[in-house]
Amino acid sequence: MEAETGSDQQLRDVLEIASALSSEADLPRLLDLILAKARALTSADAGSIYLVEKGKNARFGLSESGEADVDKLWFAAAQNSSLEARSLGKDQIDPDAIETNRSQVFDVRFPISAERLVGWAVLERETLNIPDVYHLDPSLPYQFDASVDRQLGYRAVSMMSVPMQADNGDVVGVLQLINRKKDFRFVITPENATDNTLAFDRSDQVLIEALSNVAAVCVQRTQLMASQDQLLDSVIALMAGAIDAKSPYTAGHCERVPQLAMMLAKEAEDQQDGPFQDFAFEDAEAWREFRIGAWLHDCGKVTTPEYVVDKASKLEANFNRIHEIRTRFEVLLRDAQIARLEGRLAGGDPAQLDQDFEAREQELQDQFQFIAAANLGAEFFDQEKITRLQEIAKQTWVRHFDDSLGLAWEESQRRLAHAPATDQLPVVEQLLSDQPWQRKKRSESEALPEGYGFDLDVPEDTFNYGELHNLSVSRGTLTPEERYKINEHVVQTIVMLESLPLPRELMRVPEYAGTHHETLRGDGYPRKLPPEKLSVPSRIMAICDIFEALTASDRPYKKAKSLSVAVDILAGFRDRGHIDSDLFELFLTSDVYRQYAEQFMAEDQIDRVDIEKYLKAT
């Protein structure tokens, strides 16, 4: 068997390097690796990588300043063994240490120009191999900029600038090697540089050109993966922003919940003892997975009708029907006025008639005020109030106009199916009523999706617009049908996300996004999951979703709660078994609640919170 030649060894080295590069997905680490391997192959004291950045502002091809947004070179990475050794006070360089070198990153960008060595390499797609950059022919289009040497206290001599060209012909950057050394262990200074460096020879150039092409493919792949991640993140943020913008009643919610969730998750991961000492996300991808789940936790709200989300009063549909009912009261008052006048014409006692009218007017005023207050849903509407509502509703008024005219097709079909338009006008009707045609039956397409483990009580109707049905709601403004429609957003969130071909590193996004309404009592929705099936990130989402909703100052239907009131309400959720007590305690003791408040709450909301009364006795 023939002995292995130097070129065979170099080829083996390049293949091993190519294999190593192809397995690295992190761009900074990839650039470190490319530089270290290229320098090791050529005994280069220093090296740099410049990456091409395409002009990013596509609007009319102009930048924010109005100038053409041209392609630029980004000084992305640099290594220099001699400068590092000198900074550490060493008089010799360990050749093995090159593998552990970490690049400096300079936030420097400049237009691609043939006047610079690296710019010429990009534009001409050719390698520049220069024995001494300080002795270039002045007639050449490119020249060396010695200002960096003067700034660093260095002396570049031999330099090779190699374009990094991918398979598709694109030049993604330039790999630049500086000062091929006679003895790699030697520390170069401006005084000894020329005596201790060699020019890069032809074999060096061939080798590095081959390596550069492999590196270009790896860089391009890594940049593509990063840009895909960035695009996905941007689309997710766009969707979350669209949901927030869809309704002023949820403005900012989808943006703030992820930030609060990340804050609390970071505190949980930092715990060295206690219930969260073993909690940690595996890596940066796991953190990103959680962040995306948090961003998408309300994505199902794109299917929720705005007027349901925005319903600020019980009788509100696409308009507030309290105005219609007030008109009926006006009719009853007008009837009372007519009755008084008719009584006078019939010879009745004017004083008694006036007294009866004033009593009736006051009664109607009181009744309407009662209904108007009930419509707001601000107070609990108990059975006694429901009984009074039903008594008021029994009053009658006379309708003289056909109520089947001017209806949209769907509503007219419901109306005609239950009450054909054969009534003889005028018609005597109750003041308030629930009519069969005011109920919109649930269709088969609206059935709860199967195969997801959903456990929800589904109302018979999709909507019920009955006046008594709506006014009799005991808490808030939403009927059972509307409450289900709101809660259904989590169902849609899970169905939407589980239908996506998510990569392995994002497989838990549906879990994180779809469990923030589950409880530790096992009675949450949409699956009534037991506590053992709720991960720490899922429990974090539940706390953050509630706290953000309590403290939001941009909701037009309610006054924002103070910090102390919000914490007290959250403690109630803890006491009733809705949220994790350990996380709630960490939320307080880590000061996350206050950090969030200072960043997102109005100054007049932030007051003192006595957290001691909420902490478990030890």
Segments predicted by a language model, with ranges:
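Signal-transmission linkers at sensory-effector interfaces
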Residues: 1-33, 37-41, 62, 206, ...
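Divalent-cation-assisted or electrostatically stabilized phosphate/pyrophosphate-binding catalytic cores
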Residues: 195, 199-203, 239, 310-339, ...
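Signal-transducing coupling segments at domain and membrane junctions
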Residues: 114-119, 126-127, 131-160, 184-198, ...
